[in-house]
Amino acid sequence: MKVLKIAAVAVLVIGLSSLVMAEGMKRDAMTHSKKMMQPPFGTKADVDFAKEMWKKISKAGFLGVHGNLYVGGPPHGKVREVVEGVVDNKLVIVKSNYGGKGVSIKSVTKDPKKYLKAVTVMVKRGGYDPDNKDWFWVKYAPDGTVLKNKKGMQLAGRVAKGMSVGCISCHQSASGADFVFSHNKTVNASVTWIGDKSLKAKFADLMK
């Protein structure tokens, strides 16, 4: 009788252990499923990071005209300017995009606020997206609001990852394998470095 009781207890323990393991596996599967379902961009974490980055690039002097305006085509502004520098030990590239009736280098120089349509930013975040050179992408309105695509998704994070059209797919074609067109030797743009110029050498390998 005693042996039977011990056996029954053992069976119960094994059963409970199996149940606990099953529940754990179920939770892991659900967590994995949620991660798989999570969009590559536009999450709360992405937007929060983008908002903080806007404050920092504004304070660091990345916004406004610095004198290297040039003409370009879509999807960016007809007139644009690229500046780069380091914020929080991260390489940051800021492109101001100008457009509208009468836009030209001369008109933008005279009244940049009138023609500014969007500010697009790339932030190098170590380990963020190894498949795509660890760039964080974001598109702002002139007032710093994170803009949305036609589906209502906020354009911050791994924007359009895995899609045939969008930031990542377009920049993959940039020469030098760094996803940055303004580092191309043939591009018709000069890039202004903002802030401590000694940091430029430190980040030189990221700008080839």
Locations of regions flagged by a protein language model:
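Sequence context surrounding c-type heme c attachment/ligation sites in exported
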Residues: 26-38, 90-208
